[in-house]
Amino acid sequence: MNIHAVVIVLSYLIGSIPFGLILSYIGGLGDIRKVGSGNIGATNVFRKSKKLAVMTLLLDAVKGLISVLLAKIYSTDQTFAFISAMFSIIGHMFPVWLLFKGGKGISTLLGSMVLIEYKFVICFLFIWITLFAIFKYSSLSSIVSTIFVALLVYMYYTMNDTAVFIAMSLLIITQHADNIARMLSGKENKLNIGL
């Protein structure tokens, strides 16, 4: 097994660590999958604990950051950094430890992009905060922000990089399919975080 394959496997396994679930148990909240949307990500954890939600967001982001860091240590290929990020996100979405039922990948995406292009993270957060302040839908804000960053990657990176990022974006949008259906039917819950 070559080093690229090792990094990809490690990226998936790191991404698979279910910090939202672990922190919820440590914090005495029990199984977060039985609360709200049933998701293990920061948004669902927020419904029970703001502090644990922040910790979940940061740790899920670190998963992406570490995966890209490993890619950059062992390869100078920029596209490989995107691939490692994608496998970390896949791990977060489909963790082997939880029968492949995980989160939606936004925090892990942001963490991975910190080392690829931090300015895109700033753009993502600006758009997310703006849309959330207006509509109060975390899912809508995440989807639109991800699409915008995909356009930035297309404008400033190679076609190979863009292809990988589009694949990541499609995975993220697919993970939000239930949210999209609820928004279209007017049944999506708004989230109040003080914005």
UniProtKB/Swiss-Prot annotation:
Gene Ontology, cellular component aspect: plasma membrane
MF terms (GO), sorted A to Z: acyl-phosphate glycerol-3-phosphate acyltransferase activity
Entry keyword annotation includes Transmembrane helix: yes
Keyword match Repressor: no
Catalytic activity: an acyl phosphate + sn-glycerol 3-phosphate = a 1-acyl-sn-glycero-3-phosphate + phosphate
Pathway where this protein functions: Lipid metabolism; phospholipid metabolism
One of the GO BP terms on file: phospholipid biosynthetic process
Alphabetically ordered keywords of this record: Cell inner membrane, Cell membrane, Lipid biosynthesis, Lipid metabolism, Membrane, Phospholipid biosynthesis, Phospholipid metabolism, Transferase, Transmembrane, Transmembrane helix
Quaternary data: Probably interacts with PlsX.
Family according to the record: Belongs to the PlsY family.
Record-linked NCBIfam families: glycerol-3-phosphate 1-O-acyltransferase PlsY
Protein name in UniProt: Glycerol-3-phosphate acyltransferase
Gene symbol of the encoding locus: plsY
